[in-house]
Amino acid sequence: MAQLYFYYSSMNAGKSTHLLQSSYNYQERGLVTAIYTAKIDDRFAKGKVASRLGIDADAFLFDEKINLFKDVDQKHQAEKIDCVLIDEAQFLSTEQVKQLTDIVDLLHIPVLAYGIRTDFLGQTFSGSAALLAWADKLVELKTICHCGRKANFVIRQDANGKAVQNGEQVEVGGNERYEPLCRAHFKQLVWL
């Protein structure tokens, strides 16, 4: 039975690596996957999901305008799709998460979504909030804070490495801008 999975974490926990491994596992068995990633994420080449380990795969791009159910249904009619994988799922709209549930419930295709739970201020992304509410399975991928504790949060840093305490929720960046932290260190830097 197909299900909607949400793999969530802070940054640098290996979400993209896990997605690429899952896709490979399907493909190794002769099954077809459809990988999607956010158009807004320009850290790597457009139309690619890439891991810091150096592996990557081609991906379809999504933005706020795409109807994921219709897009997957069209692709599925042309070639049977056995699994849909979504990278950067925090950037999905609530409506797009509903579309993912339709892919599972109506097309009977499993969907594996990977994303960050909270932003640099500790607020939930709308896509992540909807996935936390509606996914059949929730899986936390763990990373660690510099102190060795589990990192549940992420801070955004300015050019001087100082924690930013305001700004737009979405600002794409990598290790040079964001750092995963445990709650205690996050509170010290952001909630002052």
Curated annotation (Swiss-Prot):
Q: Where does Zn(2+) bind?
A: C145, C147, C182, H185
User: Does this entry carry the keyword Cytoplasm?
Assistant: yes
Pfam families associated with the record: TK
Q: Which GO terms describe its cellular component?
A: cytosol
HAMAP family recorded for this chain? Thymidine_kinase
Q: Which protein are we looking at?
A: Thymidine kinase
Q: How does it assemble?
A: Homotetramer.
Gene that specifies this protein: tdk
Give the catalysed reaction(s), semicolon-separated. Answer: thymidine + ATP = dTMP + ADP + H(+)
Q: Name one GO molecular function term.
A: zinc ion binding
Q: Which family does it belong to?
A: Belongs to the thymidine kinase family.
Which residues are listed for ATP binding in this entry? Answer: S9, S10, M11, N12, A13, G14, K15, S16, D87, E88, A89, Q90
Identify the NCBIfam families for this entry.
PRK04296.1-5 (NF003300)
EC number, as in UniProt? 2.7.1.21
Instruction: Spell out the subcellular localization from the entry.
Output: Cytoplasm
Question: Keyword set for this entry?
Answer: ATP-binding, Cytoplasm, DNA synthesis, Kinase, Metal-binding, Nucleotide-binding, Transferase, Zinc
Keyword Aminoacyl-tRNA synthetase attached: no
Tell me the active site: E88
For the biological process aspect of GO, one term held by this record is: thymidine metabolic process
Q: Which organism is it from?
A: Colwellia psychrerythraea (strain 34H / ATCC BAA-681) (Vibrio psychroerythus)
